[in-house]
Each structure stands twice: as structure tokens, then as C-alpha cells.
Amino acid sequence: KYLDYFKPKAFIMENVIGMLSKKTESGENVIDIIMEQLSRNYNCIINKLYASDFEVPQNRRRVIIVGIRKDLNIIPSEPEIVIKSKEDRMPVKNILLNKEEVDNSHYLSEKAIQGINNKKQRSKERGAGFGAQFLNLDKPSYTIPARYWKDGYDALVKYSDTEIRRLSILELKRIQSFPDDFILVGSKKDMIMQIGNAVASRFAYHLG
């Protein structure tokens, strides 16, 4: 609707990888329908890209569609990967606060840690996956979702078995490659949802 109304010369569309496998009630691939509609007026290319290949300390994989209006007679070029090797991706330790800078409110309680351990054991016995994820500080972060405000278990910092914490708002901004002085509004929940729903700024910069 936006493209039909504004008719921009070009656009960049970002979405989760899951959209590639999403189907309608009648069994059609949603992405095929989208691409058919976009291709009426735009020359389009579609890619699956990692934000960590574009100077973002986060393994955030996304579908990127780039389109240029057909009357301009330009075919979009493939995005150029900035970080050529997995070994050169930015590790999350580069943007984390020092331990002494983190407020105690970010640390999990003894009860919460015990709950994680119990759930981990039950999941292991069932042969199922386990929800809580501990960051490997030498690698990019896991994807930060909008739901991170609920418990923060998608990406936890583990110093020891008894010292485990959630990421701070500042660290979440950095993981999405936003500058420290970037202003967020609303409650803590609102701010985390804004971060989780955003396109990582360095990712967008290189694509644009």
C-alpha cells in the first residue's frame, strides 16, 4: 500500500527469515505473492543476510528485498558483504559494559537461576531444546527479539553459575549498533520492544 501510494524511486524491505516458509490458508507461499506484487512496478532482488556481516555485533539473520522502480531502468545490485569472514565478525564482548558498571537489578535471582537449571535438566531428559541462551563473548550476540523485555533469557551474560545477568538498555542499543546517545522513549518494556523490532542501524547504513 505504501509503495502504491508514495511510488518511491527505490525501497528496502526487511523481515524475519520465517516469512520465506510462511503459507496462506490455501497453501500458497506468502513470499511468492509478495514478490509478484512488488515486481509489477519494481525490479527486485531478495537476499538472506546476517547483520553480523555488516559491522553489527549480533547474528541477526533477515530477509532483505531491494526494489528500484521499473521506469528508471536500473537493476538493483547485490549487497556487498562488509565482513568477509566469520572470524572477523564483531564479538559481543566489544560492546558489553564492565561488570562493575552493571546495576544489580540486571542480575537473576537465585530462584530464577535454579528455575533455569531445572528447566534445562527437564529439556535434556526430553531431548528438547532449551530456552535460555548464554552469550559466547568471543562471538556476536544471539538475535535480540522484541520479547526480550519478558525475561531476557534470549541472551544472558554468565560470569559464573551464580552470577548471571540480563543485558542493559545501553548494551541492547549497542548490539543493534545504535549510538549510545540514541534516544528511546516510553517504559523499559517499550524501549526494549523498540530495539528488538528495529533494523540494526549499521546494517541499514550499508544496505542503503
Model-derived regions, located:
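C-terminal target-recognition/interaction regions appended to catalytic cores
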Residues: 107-208
